[in-house]
Amino acid sequence: MITHFRQAIEETLPWLSSFGADPTGGMTRLLYSPEWLETQQQFKKRMAASGLETRFDEVGNLYGRLNGSEYPQEVILSGSHIDTVVNGGNLDGQFGALAAWLAIDWLKTQYGAPLRTVE
């Protein structure tokens, strides 16, 4: 399992970090900036391709949802943010969002639909 997550992170973290990348090795994705909007759209596509229902709320937060089979009205939330400060690092915020998505995808693959809905 650790090997799976290590490989998944090594494949997806550079991809996610490429949006808003700057020449010094950091990235800048200020809230509602073109870089942030592009990242949101690309991350949404990846989540949808993995079988999650995706949506944006009124302020632009992105959700990926896997409906529960027994208690769908009970929702477990996990995640983080993908906006950054100027020249931010690649683990701040986006790593939490990425980790939540990868964990949900792995659990779905291993065990099928969860009893409770996860987002």
Model-flagged regions — what are they?
Residues 5-12, 35, 39, 43, ...:
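General structural feature for long, well-ordered alpha-helical segments within catalytic domains
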Residues 13, 17-20, 50-54, 104-111:
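Structural signal for hydrophobic packing residues in well-ordered secondary-structure cores
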Residues 21-67:
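A non-catalytic alpha/beta surface segment that caps or lines the substrate-entry region
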Residues 41-45, 60, 76, 98-105:
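N-terminal, well-ordered alpha-helical segments
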